[in-house]
Amino acid sequence: MATPSGREDSSSQTPGHGKQGSGACVEQLDHPEKLEVEMPDQSAMWKKAQEFFQTCDSEGKGFIARTDMQRLHQELPLSLEELEDVFDALDADGNGFLTPEEFTTGFSHFFFSQNIQGEEEADQQVAQLQEEKVYQSRGEEDVGDMDHDEEAQFQMLMDRLGAQKVLEDESDVRQLWLQLRKDEPHLLSNFEDLLTTIFAQLQEAHEQKNELECALRKKIAAYDEEIQHLYEEMEQQIKSEREQFLLKDTERFQARSRELEKKLSAKEQELERLNQKQRKLEGQCAALHNDKHETKAENSKLRLTNQELARELERTSHQLQEAQQQLESLQREACELQQEKEMEVYRVTESLQREKSGLLKQLDFLRERNKHLRDERDITFQKDKAAKANTAASKASRKQRSGSVIGKYVDGRGILRSQSEEEEDVFSAPRRRSSVGLSAYLQAEEDLGTGEPGSGVPRRQALRRIISIEEDPLPQLLEGGFEKPLSRCPEEEEVSDQGTERQSVAAPVLDLIPTSPRGQPVGKETLYKEERVPSTPDRLFKIVFVGDSAVGKTSFLRRLCEARFSPGMAATVGIDYRVKTVTVDNAQVALQLWDTAGQERYRCISQQFFRKADGVAVMYDLTAKQSFLSIRQWLSSVEEAVGDRIPVLLLGNKLDNEKEREVPRGLGEQLAKENNLIFYECSACSGHNAQESLLHLARLLKEQEDTVRNDTIQVGPPAKKKSCCG
């Protein structure tokens, strides 16, 4: 016979028969108006049927085939066989496809049949609930009669098992015992045996627990006794340590007291000495007090003397300031004089340049005149043609090369005069010193050599230009003209015999000796008209170009000054110079560019020009390794003459001839880095780095001069000394 609790458990295991389900059914029975079945709306049903048809007809054919229905296998929880059964049920005519009307009609019939089945199941549930309600009411009446007997039996069981000592709440066990007694009576004895075993084990565990608690209490008591013993021992040790510490402290205090007594006695003795010293100092102070009056009187005298000295110092300061102002005025005047001197040097240099150009034009005129006279001479001496040819061939072996200065100026030479005799005359000429600088003059001398046999050519005078190497270059050609006029002028002629040799043929005597000093040279008037008056430069620097022969110094200077290149130029003899004006940082800078001869016999002249140079340019040939090896010798000459106080420009020329290079760029850079030089590789032929290198050197010279001017020592007024006595 089932109890209410048993019905609740069994109903909870069956779906649709739980408390909620039974309650809902009873509520429906109590309210029969809620049992009305709400039918779905007809339009909603038709709409759902159409949506399901469109889902099946994904291709939009207007009908559904069996394959379309099988595609829903993945979307619906139905197997293929079930889907085929649905298709067969909807296909009433059996034509193998479903139209929208057939699908909607079949779907509505299926829906209505499901609703009818649901109503029948609902009726069955209502009937079952009514039966359960009747059964429940009968069970409650039986429980009322049996409660008293079951409670007595359960209490007897608990007393027999001794559960009161183990369990505090017997409700759970009572409920389980009653459930088994009602539902499963045959299992009740097993349950009671299980309870007997469990309670026996619990009783045993309880006894073990009591034993463990007793052992634990004994252990705690023993531990407390041990702790108490340790505490007493610690108290005894602390007491003994305290007594020892007090004993040591007493001894230490006594020793400290004795030490302090000794120090006190020493301090008393020191105090006595200080008292004696104080008495002595008081006596000295009294003596010093007497001296104080004397010192005051002396200080008064010194104060008066100090005032007089201060007034004298002030007068001296005023005089020193006046002297300083005069010194500054003199410095300004000296600076102005220096600038005027530089401008004068520049103007004289320009005049010398124009004089040189005029002389060149005069030489051209004389050459033309000599050619005309030579033609007349050839007609006159046709009979002696063979003898003259032999004489010219003998002179070809002793020809000399024309220099850029001495060669371009008229260099009078005899017909039979050799190059060695020429050099001997030049260097044996007396050197002249000038307070201004370079002394250049023209000297006409008679040639002692004889003319050609039978030609009747008299002795001629040659034009000589001697350059002083002792002082600054300041030509004095404009200070009164020449002592002797230009009387005779030889001509060097290049006679090409199949491009193999040159012959120097002497020109006949020109009877052009005037009685008065020479005036303007031929073509000089035209030169003054063609040349534009240059602007006054702000700075003037002298730069000396040195290097082995044939490295291209003259061609480089011609490229700088004339912007052209002339191949096959003759070697420089002696010294030549040019003037180049450049603009550096908005300032006009005039550069005197001195071209020196590279031959060994002219090096003594070149080295003398280093002393007054502002800068030096050392050049070598990129295609000749020997010229680069000579650079160190040139640098040694510069260092011996001027030390390291002037900048040096290292130039590697003939960069245009890269195929024949023998000196790598790295060697030049390394040499420049070791000796602190300015390094450029240039080309006189193409003009590459010609202007750039010169501007770099000019800018460096200008910066050095600005630094020297700014570092000029300014003498300031001396600081006024304070008097010692106020």
Curated annotation (Swiss-Prot):
The processes (GO biological process) annotated in the record are: activation of store-operated calcium channel activity; adaptive immune response; endosomal transport; positive regulation of calcium ion transport; positive regulation of JNK cascade; protein localization; response to histamine; store-operated calcium entry
| Stretches for region Switch-II | 598-614
Keyword Iron, does the record have it? no
Q: Which organism does this sequence originate in?
A: Mus musculus (Mouse)
**Positions of the UniProt region annotated as Disordered:** 1-30
Q: Where is this region: Proline-rich domain (PRD) which mediates interaction with VAV1?
A: 343-535
- Which parts of the chain are coiled coil? 202-376
The residues covered by the EF-hand domain are 78-113
Q: Pfam families this protein is in? A: EF-hand_7, Ras
On whether Cytoplasm is a keyword of this UniProt record, the answer is yes
Annotated gene? Cracr2a
Compositional bias of kind Basic and acidic residues: 1-10
Query: Where is Ca(2+) bound in this sequence?
Result: D91, D93, N95, E102
Family assignment from sequence similarity: Belongs to the EFCAB4 family.
SUPFAM superfamilies given for it? EF-hand, P-loop containing nucleoside triphosphate hydrolases
Alphabetical keyword list: Adaptive immunity, Calcium, Calcium transport, Cell membrane, Coiled coil, Cytoplasm, Cytoskeleton, Golgi apparatus, GTP-binding, Hydrolase, Immunity, Ion transport, Lipoprotein, Magnesium, Membrane, Metal-binding, Nucleotide-binding, Prenylation, Repeat, Transport
The record's section on PROSITE patterns has: EF_HAND_1 (PS00018), EF_HAND_2 (PS50222), RAB (PS51419)
Q: Which GO terms describe its cellular component?
A: cytoplasm; Golgi membrane; immunological synapse; microtubule organizing center; plasma membrane; trans-Golgi network membrane; vesicle; Weibel-Palade body
Q: Which residues bind Mg(2+)?
A: T554, T572, D595
Please give the cofactor(s) recorded in the UniProt entry for this protein: Mg(2+)
Source domain of life is Eukaryota
Q: Where does GTP bind?
A: S549, V551, G552, K553, T554, S555, S566, P567, T572, G598, N653, K654, D656, A684
Q: What is this protein called?
A: EF-hand calcium-binding domain-containing protein 4B
Region ranges (Switch-I): 567-575
The family database entries (InterPro entries) matched by this protein are listed as: EF-hand-dom_pair (IPR011992), EF_Hand_1_Ca_BS (IPR018247), EF_hand_dom (IPR002048), P-loop_NTPase (IPR027417), Rab (IPR050227), Small_GTP-bd (IPR005225), Small_GTPase (IPR001806)
